[in-house]
Amino acid sequence: YPEKFDQLCKDLPDPVLFESQMGYKRAHGQASHDRLALQYRPALEKVLAPSWRNFIHELHSEAYKDFWREMLGLTSRTPVILTMHWHYAPSGASISPHTDARRKIGSHIFYFNTPEDWEEAWGGQTLVLDDGGKWPRHSAPVYTDLREAGASQVLGNRSFLFAQTDHSWHAVKAVQCPSGHLRKVFIVVANRLTPQVIWRRVRGKDADGYRLAGGVQKN
């Protein structure tokens, strides 16, 4: 449905709604994950375009959760708890090599740049990195410690789904785009129903720890 993709690109949330996460210190000695971030929560419905409301409602369907179960070989009764967020990255922003939290089953990254606002040569690809089973998840390898096993594509209405394991290292090298351009992705995270996720739900938070009743984020 290229026409729906085009509409979603046109209707992406305004960067003014996003929280800056540039230069934040990370655990285990890992370099920062530089981005502007907007966490989906129900309060956002009032400011999202109809195209995005419809897309998110579709992603919350049982059909999409069943897609996750089929892709990762889960049973039909395995709980799949979804969280979603937009990330925009300006020139120079990067995501250092890391694995995701154990509560995550995996991530599905949708890329929302077009040839009108992005070039593949500027970067932004999600890199799949092989550590040869040598690096513990709570560590900070650099690119020279890892082998690049694959990379996503940014343009062409692409998405990229991967499972979380103790060795599912991935990263994004510093994007090299002109000023005023942004790498734009929307990420759906599938989470396990862990004690942490249950406790967060009891406290009115989503699986990522954001308050479900929170208002629209603004800088």
Model regions and ranges:
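Non-heme Fe(II)/2-oxoglutarate
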Residues: 1-70
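Amphipathic alpha-helical surface "interface" segments used
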Residues: 27-34, 89-90, 206-213
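Short, cationic low-complexity segments
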Residues: 133-137, 203-219
